Amino acid sequence: MQIADDEFRQLVERVDIDGHISVWGTYGVTTVRYLNRHAPILSNFRLGDVLPLLDSAAGRIFLTYLSERTTRPILKAEASKSEESKPSAKETAAITQFVRREGYAWIDGQLFHSIRAIAVPIFDSQGELQATISLVSNQASLVQFPNPVLDDLKATGKKISHRLGWSS
């Protein structure tokens, strides 16, 4: 985690955007580090918060790379708590295919109105997903692709993964 934390701090300073590191915990995608560059975008966002699988960029990374057996109970619990319609199986498959193909996930207002986020995976030496790093902003430019912030985030994710022994 120290390797990820050091690189993450440098990234957040370089791009001057809030960010967080998340891992898979007992209840799903759990935030273990959050750095604010400005006034907090999400004033009620706390360490230990559990993020949704479909409505957060970090969640979409975990949904893509963890087994269905692992994620299914969390998806069911999320669906039972929400009155909003969730993506169909086909739409969910399109999300995970995008993440695998492009190497990142993004959201634009799904979790909170006007909040945008992009996230990338962190893999270990065996190619297993260990964490995600995400950048969060209320600026629309964060999710206008391609953009240099996304390029930096992807490069940082790969650098952390390589330092953990992953080889692409």
Where are the language model's segments positioned?
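Juxtadomain coupling helices with adjacent low-complexity linkers
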Residues: 90-97, 102, 113-115, 130-168
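Short loop/turn motifs at secondary-structure junctions and domain boundaries
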Residues: 13-14, 109-115
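Amphipathic alpha-helical effector-binding/dimerization core
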Residues: 1-77
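Short loop/turn microsegments at loop-to-beta-strand junctions
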Residues: 19, 50, 95, 117-119
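Short hydrophobic/aromatic beta-strand element in the GNAT-like acyltransferase core
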Residues: 31, 107, 119
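Sensor-regulatory modules in signal-transduction proteins
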Residues: 122-125
